């Protein structure tokens, strides 16, 4: 890895499956990586609060710890006092029902675990609510 110019580099959630998160964080710092996007090695970041707190403390500001997975205004409100995490990654999504009229049961045109009749959209109100919480930190 050779860093080029002023480009900011984020280590994405592959971090969440590493064997030793503290050692991996130290390696990321030594490589000049700016940010680690993580859920604290759990499915959602609120469940990973203990590791997120440890990462923030042990990083001592040398790298940004960015919480992701399950982030919304209420999660930020709960997570910040527990962890000190100040950077968050979120979709701000809202699920809306498809306007498709005919729905054929038993046939899936995509991935079986995803609904054919739901659409995920970024919702401006969810983003505004999260921004408001962040401004109050």
Predicted regions and their residues:
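A polyampholytic, Gly/Pro-enriched intrinsically disordered region
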Residues: 30-35, 112-113
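Catalytic beta/alpha-barrel core
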Residues: 8-19, 34-46, 66-68
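Helix C-cap/helix->beta junction micro-motif
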Residues: 3-7, 59-62, 137
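Glycine-rich phosphate-binding active-site loops on the catalytic face of alpha/beta enzymes
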Residues: 33-46, 83-104
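Conserved small/polar residues in nucleotide/adenosyl-binding loops
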Residues: 1-4, 98
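Generic recognition of short, well-ordered alpha-helical segments
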Residues: 22-23, 47-50
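C-terminal helical cap(s) of enzyme catalytic domains, especially alpha/beta-barrels
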Residues: 49-58, 78-83, 97-137
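Catalytic cores of alpha/beta
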Residues: 16-31, 55-67, 71-90, 106
